[in-house]
């Protein structure tokens, strides 16, 4: 059992999630001021002593225009804690920024996810907690421990309680998500189908091919994130054109950037379900949210007490 106390700090990216984690742990959020000067430089002040404490900084990767500002907030907060002589700094990043830039997929392309890992370590981070990394190998970019939590247990609970899964089929919108969907199918004893998509450029899918029979069935379309929603909407159209009864999209990270709102309004999706790893303010009837703050809070508690977090890979806290 650790003798130093938990200190929770939060940037401006997701105050709602930070408050839920605080309530779950019974630990108040520490006083933090994050401001921008007129020239847009970020300034941070920590309003209480954190010397020799176990500090957790909650800041998610989010925002069409603010994502880089939020990243700078996180780095400056980490550095401020480091210079304040804390015992350990854990960055809690539910949605890891730049996670899709994880490999050199064309000439002269940067591996930006590796750069983010370097920046976090250089700032003084000792540990990272995140959820459903777009590419799990990003953990290997770090020289510090990374706990990549899974949204799967919470998704399983939602499917079991909020859908007629006995008369449904799971669908992966691309080959990369097949492993994720196969894991859910095994646990739910369900069949699954696969959509192969061909991209000509980023965020734009040109053609989709369905592998599997979805005629007359409810389709649960599973993915790790919904950004512009082009993939999900085209996948939904493909499924409906092949005779699907309805399509429910279930994702971990509901980014919903660009024209996502308009696409969802005009789509044939019956429902889109996401967690609250990032703020969602679409105000659409078809959008439903799953709260993952209990999982993150329990991971913080276990890490602070020196307990294993592997239980959370297969179970959602009650």
From Swiss-Prot:
Instruction: Name the UniProt key words of this record, in alphabetical order.
Output: ATP-binding, Cytoplasm, Kinase, Magnesium, Metal-binding, Nucleotide biosynthesis, Nucleotide-binding, Transferase
UniProt pathway annotation: Metabolic intermediate biosynthesis; 5-phospho-alpha-D-ribose 1-diphosphate biosynthesis; 5-phospho-alpha-D-ribose 1-diphosphate from D-ribose 5-phosphate (route I): step 1/1
Taking the first listed entry, what is the main subcellular location of this protein, grouped into a coarse class? Answer: cytoplasm
One GO biological-process annotation of the entry reads: 5-phosphoribose 1-diphosphate biosynthetic process
Query: What does it catalyze?
Result: D-ribose 5-phosphate + ATP = 5-phospho-alpha-D-ribose 1-diphosphate + AMP + H(+)
**Molecular function, one GO term:** magnesium ion binding
Q: Give me the residues that bind Mg(2+), please.
A: 132, 134, 143, 147
Q: Where in the cell is it found?
A: Cytoplasm
As for what it does, the entry says: 5-phosphoribose 1-diphosphate synthase involved in nucleotide, histidine, and tryptophan biosynthesis. Active in heteromultimeric complexes with other 5-phosphoribose 1-diphosphate synthases (PRS2, PRS3, PRS4 and PRS5).
Family of this protein: Belongs to the ribose-phosphate pyrophosphokinase family.
NCBIfam families xrefs: PRK01259.1, ribP_PPkin
The miscellaneous annotation reads: Present with 8120 molecules/cell in log phase SD medium.
UniProt xrefs under PANTHER family: RIBOSE-PHOSPHATE DIPHOSPHOKINASE FAMILY MEMBER, RIBOSE-PHOSPHATE PYROPHOSPHOKINASE 2
Question: What is the protein's name according to its record?
Answer: Ribose-phosphate pyrophosphokinase 2
What organism does the UniProt record list as the source?
Answer: Saccharomyces cerevisiae (strain ATCC 204508 / S288c)
């Amino acid at each position: 059992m650790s003798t130093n106390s938990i200190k929770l700090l939060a940037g401006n990216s997701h105050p709602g999630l930070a408050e839920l984690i605080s309530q779950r742990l019974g630990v108040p959020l520490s006083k933090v001021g994050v401001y921008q000067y007129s020239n847009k430089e970020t300034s941070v002040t920590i309003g209480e002593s954190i010397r020799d404490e176990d500090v957790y900084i909650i800041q998610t990767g989010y925002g069409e225009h603010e994502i880089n500002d939020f990243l700078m907030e996180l780095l400056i907060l980490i550095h401020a804690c480091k210079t304040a002589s804390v015992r350990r700094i854990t960055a809690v990043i539910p949605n890891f920024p730049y996670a899709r830039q994880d490999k050199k997929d064309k000439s002269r392309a940067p591996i930006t996810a590796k750069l983010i890992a370097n920046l976090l370590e250089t700032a003084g981070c000792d540990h990272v907690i995140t959820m459903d990394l777009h590419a799990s190998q990003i953990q290997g970019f770090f020289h510090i421990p990374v706990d990549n939590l899974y949204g799967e247990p919470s998704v399983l609970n939602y499917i079991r309680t909020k859908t007629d899964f006995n008369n449904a089929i799971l669908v992966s919108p691309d080959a990369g998500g097949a492993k994720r969907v196969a894991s859910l199918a095994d646990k739910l004893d369900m069949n699954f189908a696969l959509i192969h998509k061909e991209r000509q450029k980023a965020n734009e899918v040109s053609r989709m091919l369905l592998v599997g029979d979805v005629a007359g069935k409810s389709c649960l379309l599973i993915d790790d994130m919904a950004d512009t929603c082009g993939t999900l909407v085209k996948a939904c159209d493909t499924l409906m054109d092949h005779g699907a009864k309805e399509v429910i999209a279930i994702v971990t990270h509901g980014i919903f950037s660009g024209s996502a709102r308009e696409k969802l309004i005009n789509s044939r999706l019956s429902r889109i379900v996401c967690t609250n790893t990032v703020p969602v303010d679409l105000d659409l009837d078809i959008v439903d949210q799953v709260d993952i703050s209990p999982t993150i809070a329990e991971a913080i508690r276990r890490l602070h007490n020196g307990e294993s977090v592997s239980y959370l890979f297969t179970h959602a806290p009650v």
